[in-house]
Regions:
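Fe-S-dependent hydro-lyases/dehydratases of central metabolism
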Residues: 1-160
Length: 160
């Protein structure tokens, strides 16, 4: 189990997919094979359920067995909004749990990233000069990693 402590808060123009891409840079497409990524830290209070889903879904790109977040008040409110509060259960790490590895990601230091062809771990800074004159003729919004109402609403505001 790899514990990923998330601290800080994402800056404008950065989203949770950038956190997942940062992890892909570190671990590659096979770095998560046979591993569980467990997310923790004070930064969780800044992540809504769809954002957490983006991170866990992107875990598959690293080959992870699974990715998990503890339940908290945000989770409880999500269940309540779905009329499923009766299904809510407390799910947190045991006191004194040990891990095979532990890393910390300061979300305030994450920059916008791009997954380039032809592998998900071919990651580049979105502001890299190689993208300066790149013309984008179409985009795809709706995958398991960016299909929440919030993602689609942002794209609409940008006229994508």
């Amino acid at each position: 189990i790899i514990k990923v402590n998330l601290i800080g808060r994402l800056k404008g123009g950065v989203n949770t997919k950038d956190i997942a891409l940062e992890l892909l840079k570190k671990y590659s497409v096979k770095g998560g094979v046979g591993k569980v990524f467990e997310y923790a830290g004070e930064g969780l209070k800044h992540l809504e359920i769809p954002q957490r889903m983006t991170i866990t879904n992107m875990g598959a790109e690293m080959g992870t067995t699974t990715s998990i977040f503890p339940t908290d008040e945000i989770t409880k409110e999500f269940f309540k909004a779905q009329n499923r509060l009766g299904n809510f259960a407390k799910f947190v790490a045991d006191e004194g749990a040990t891990y095979d590895d532990e890393i910390t990601i300061d979300m305030s230091k994450i920059i916008p990233l791009v997954a380039c062809p032809s592998h998900p771990d071919n990651i580049a800074d979105a502001n890299d000069k190689k993208f300066k004159d790149l013309k984008v003729s179409s985009v795809f919004i709706g995958s398991c990693t960016n299909a929440s109402y919030g993602d689609i609403k942002k794209a609409r505001k940008k006229n994508l």
